[in-house]
């Protein structure tokens, strides 16, 4: 081996020992004839001192520059008391350099790697191999590795088998667009890259493997956001002969173990909340419980008011009127309220009514709002009592279709929590359960809220008689308002699977064409089974405090699903296209 130690391994116990380091010159400093080099490797930093008394090594140190790759041999010694650097793991020692060999030189990097600089993300991604040298970026990937090691160890110890499933498969309707791969040997046919290993892991349960897991690559061709990538990684889990309570308990234990091992944080038992309660109180199926703000229904107090903006929705069973109290918000300037009004408009809200509670004892005169003149004082007081309003508060209102009100005020709740620093703790894990089986589309048809293979809490006959009211055996783990993972008990009987397909508008011919292999498998003694999948990238993002999952993936794509480093996707030559039986059509020019 070229080295004896990593930089991060050096400490006071090695005093007096001769060691050899290999790494990059992170920083070079010349202090009164003594040269200091900070050497960096994947494990950390170490300070090496070169003294003019050793002429050859001193001359070599004088020639090196930032990002040169070097091999250094020297002796570990304690730093003087006033020179200890508590910000470095090796800050109590330094290395007196004897020998320095330059293994490779470096051009000046396009951005500094040894200090913070506000570099555009595209530049960082273009030179990702340099960006990853920065200690804060390397630390994120080291933590990611520790996380997957912890997860694999836990699952191995609990009897799970790591089984790989196909990457080249066939397209199935799972919500997002598939990435398609043309087949050279089957002209006109295409493979699809998997959006998840869902059906294969269910087939492994039919095959009797009982407990499966995989750190799986998945692919979705969809519009990207801060927490989405076209290719992403799932911690994929499936079990047989366990019910939802047992699966949730096992995976909760895995996450608690992960946080303890990696961050030394201990969580208690995760609270459970139904989908209905989460939407009613927080306007979201993944509520952030660190935020104390809650939505409160007040339609019953507004049915008879002479104000159609409220009385209309209050008397419509498909609508909702909810109030959101913000403690101390009465001092909020009008511009800030206008900004929040524009914000809820993103979610379809037509406006944002409000009441500033200046002095409740003065009745209507103590309230500041354009709407109070339209609401009787008794009703106003009933609303303010219900939301717990006191002097100095502001109360926002949403009145519209139930979905719009929940989403708009739910998003406003999150924004207010961050803008006003209302969060009460650092971590708030939970489970959301009892999801609806389906969501109804505008045309009256149904879509699966999770996926078509989720088992309902009723019989096939009951499901088909009342699909809108059916609940599923699904469960989501949520942390700080982010869905960490979602899962369910699966359908293991053919007649139930066919009933769900029918309700989704998939006729028998299409069922056979797209899911014939699954329906066949369900005829041959499929066991009760269920599972869960965690988004690894999202989990790493939360545990490292990163702002985007692009920060925790070694080589991510941009928000336009491109790789600016390798220039992917790229043009394919005509010969390759002919072999794939593909002909490109020119895009018509705009007139």
UniProtKB/Swiss-Prot annotation:
SUPFAM superfamilies: Class II aaRS and biotin synthetases, GAD domain-like, Nucleic acid-binding proteins. It is an enzyme of class 6 (ligase). L-aspartate binds at residues 174, 220, 450, 490. Disulfide bonds: none annotated. GO terms for cellular component: cytoplasm. It is found in: Cytoplasm. Keywords: Aminoacyl-tRNA synthetase, ATP-binding, Cytoplasm, Ligase, Nucleotide-binding, Protein biosynthesis. GO terms for biological process: aspartyl-tRNA aminoacylation. The record marks 31, 82 as: Important for tRNA non-discrimination. One of its GO terms (molecular function) is aspartate-tRNA(Asn) ligase activity. Residues 198-201 are annotated as: Aspartate. Pfam families: GAD, tRNA-synt_2, tRNA_anti-codon. Aspartyl-tRNA synthetase with relaxed tRNA specificity since it is able to aspartylate not only its cognate tRNA(Asp) but also tRNA(Asn). Reaction proceeds in two steps: L-aspartate is first activated by ATP to form Asp-AMP and then transferred to the acceptor end of tRNA(Asp/Asn). ATP binds at residues 220-222, 229, 483, 535-538. InterPro entries: Aa-tRNA-synt_II, aa-tRNA-synth_II, aa-tRNA-synth_II/BPL/LPL, Asp-tRNA-ligase_1, Asp-tRNA-ligase_1_N, Asp/Asn-tRNA-synth_IIb, AspRS_core, GAD-like_sf. This is Aspartate--tRNA(Asp/Asn) ligase. Belongs to the class-II aminoacyl-tRNA synthetase family. Type 1 subfamily.
């Amino acid at each position: 081996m070229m080295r004896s130690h990593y930089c991060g391994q050096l400490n006071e116990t090695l005093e007096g020992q001769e060691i050899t380091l290999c790494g990059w010159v992170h920083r070079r400093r010349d202090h009164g004839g003594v040269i200091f080099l900070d050497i960096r490797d994947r494990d950390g930093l170490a300070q090496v001192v070169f003294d003019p008394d050793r002429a050859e090594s001193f001359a070599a140190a004088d020639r090196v520059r930032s990002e040169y790759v070097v091999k250094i041999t020297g002796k570990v010694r304690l730093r003087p008391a006033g020179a200890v650097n508590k910000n470095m793991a090796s800050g109590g020692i330094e290395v007196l350099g004897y020998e320095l060999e330059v293994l490779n030189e470096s051009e000046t990097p396009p951005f500094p790697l040894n200090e913070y600089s506000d570099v555009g993300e595209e530049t960082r991604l273009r030179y990702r191999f340099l960006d990853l040298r920065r200690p804060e970026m390397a630390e994120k990937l080291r933590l990611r590795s520790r996380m997957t090691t912890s997860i694999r160890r836990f699952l191995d110890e609990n009897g799970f088998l790591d089984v790989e499933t196909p990457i080249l498969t066939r397209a199935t309707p799972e919500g997002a667009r598939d990435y398609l791969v043309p087949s050279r040997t089957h002209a006109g046919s295409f493979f699809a890259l998997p959006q998840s290993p869902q059906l294969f892991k269910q087939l492994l349960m039919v095959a009797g493997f009982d407990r499966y897991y995989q750190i799986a690559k998945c692919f979705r061709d969809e519009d990207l956001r801060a927490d989405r990538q076209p290719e992403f990684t799932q911690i994929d889990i499936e079990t047989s002969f366990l019910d939802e309570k047992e699966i949730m308990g096992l995976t909760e234990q895995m996450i608690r173990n992960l946080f303890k091992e990696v961050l030394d944080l201990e969580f208690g038992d995760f609270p459970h909340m139904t989908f209905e309660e989460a939407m009613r109180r927080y306007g979201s199926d993944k509520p952030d419980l660190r935020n104390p703000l809650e939505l409160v229904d007040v339609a019953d107090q507004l049915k008879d008011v002479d104000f159609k903006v409220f009385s209309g929705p209050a008397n419509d069973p498909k609508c909702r009127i909810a109030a959101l109290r913000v403690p101390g918000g009465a001092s909020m300037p009008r511009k800030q309220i206008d900004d929040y009004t524009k914000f809820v408009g993103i979610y379809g809200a037509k406006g944002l009514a409000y009441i500033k509670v200046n002095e409740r004892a003065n009745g209507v005169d103590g309230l500041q709002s354009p709407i109070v003149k339209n609401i009787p004082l008794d009703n106003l007081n009933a609303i303010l009592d219900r939301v717990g309003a006191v002097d100095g508060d502001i109360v926002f209102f949403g009145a519209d279709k139930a979905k719009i009100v929940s989403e708009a005020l739910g998003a406003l709740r999150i924004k207010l929590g961050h803008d006003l620093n209302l969060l009460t703790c650092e971590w708030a894990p939970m489970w959301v359960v009892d999801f609806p089986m389906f969501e109804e589309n505008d045309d009256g048809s149904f879509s699966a809220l999770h996926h078509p293979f989720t088992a309902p809490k009723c019989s096939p006959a009951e499901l088909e008689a009342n699909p809108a009211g059916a609940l599923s055996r699904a469960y989501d783990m949520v942390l700080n308002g982010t869905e960490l993972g979602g899962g369910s008990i699966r359908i293991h009987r053919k007649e139930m699977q066919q009933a769900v397909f029918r309700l989704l508008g998939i006729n028998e011919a299409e069922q056979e064409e797209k899911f014939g292999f699954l329906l066949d498998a369900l005829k041959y003694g499929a066991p009760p089974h269920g599972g869960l999948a965690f988004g690894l990238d999202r989990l790493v993002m939360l545990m490292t405090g990163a702002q985007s999952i692009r920060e925790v993936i070694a080589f991510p794509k941009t928000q336009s699903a491109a790789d600016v480093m390798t220039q992917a996707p790229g043009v394919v030559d005509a010969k390759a296209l002919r072999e794939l039986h593909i002909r490109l059509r020119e895009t018509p020019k705009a007139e």
